[in-house]
A protein has these predicted regions:
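Non-catalytic alpha-helical scaffolds and adjoining flexible linkers that form interface surfaces
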Residues: 1-21, 25-245
Length: 245
């Protein structure tokens, strides 16, 4: 069956017989792998549309469980990203991060447009690139349904002041729930030494440095509203650490 879709190239892999496998984030079908015989070194529109950091339109032959790219046209090439090392490294990281989050064959139009917004901003931005990446990641979590809960306690569900931010629990804890957890943990550790609890303890943070407000701001506002925002380096590093954990 012949079909077409807009898409963003995540990466490409060379295979045998001068063919390549393109990992494509398509608007219509989500993340798909599609083979193609279009030559990489060509200067035609189809060849240019198969490179990473490219937003294009792709004509596909869709089999029951596979895709082949017959032709492609560039809608927009973010070639300027590749001319700056910092932009390129951050852009490549975002493509890899997005690839890990996406499920195979599941359309994700919200994330698709979010990624395009990110590239538009990255191409024109000269400072605070790390802040832009963090904003993208936090909003991506929201679209994927795994964003941390920051408007109410993850245990009791009440809108109380944040006392701790817990990665294992997935959001903020009020003081009452935190103290209950501590008491329960103390009783458990009196019976047996538990290294798992000790390791989880290192994934709980005080919210004093503004993490809750930052997460709320990034979640509520569009990515384009972050274009002039740049976090302090230590705050950015801590947020990146939280995301990776």
């Amino acid at each position: 069956m012949l079909t077409d879709t807009e898409g963003i190239v995540l990466r490409q892999i060379k295979t045998s017989y001068n063919r390549r496998m393109i990992l494509l984030f398509s608007k219509k079908y989500g993340k798909i792998s599609a083979g193609t015989s279009i030559q990489e070194k060509g200067r035609g529109k189809s060849s240019l549309a198969l490179r990473p950091f490219t937003y294009g339109r792709y004509e596909l032959f869709k089999n029951r469980d596979s895709y082949n790219i017959n032709s492609a046209d560039v809608i927009k090439s973010y070639y300027a990203i590749g001319e700056n090392v910092d932009k390129y490294m951050n852009g490549a990281y975002v493509l890899e991060f997005t690839e890990r989050v996406l499920s195979e064959g599941v359309p994700a139009p919200g994330i698709f447009h979010l990624l395009l917004d990110f590239f538009d901003l990255l191409e024109s931005r000269d400072r605070g690139i790390g802040t832009l990446v963090l904003g993208y990641q936090i909003k991506l979590f929201k679209y994927a349904g795994v964003a941390p809960q920051v408007d109410r306690c993850v245990h009791c569900g009440e809108k109380k002041e944040a006392y701790k931010f817990s990665i294992p629990e997935g959001g903020i804890l009020c003081q009452e729930c935190w103290e209950k957890m501590q008491n329960q943990q103390d009783k458990t550790e009196q019976k047996s030494f538990c290294t798992e609890n000790s390791q989880q303890h290192t994934l709980i943070y005080d919210p004093e440095f503004g993490i809750v407000n930052i997460l709320k701001y990034f979640t509520i506002n569009s990515l384009k509203n972050l274009k002039n925002l740049a976090l302090k380096e230590d705050t950015g590093r801590l947020l990146q650490k939280l995301i990776r954990e």
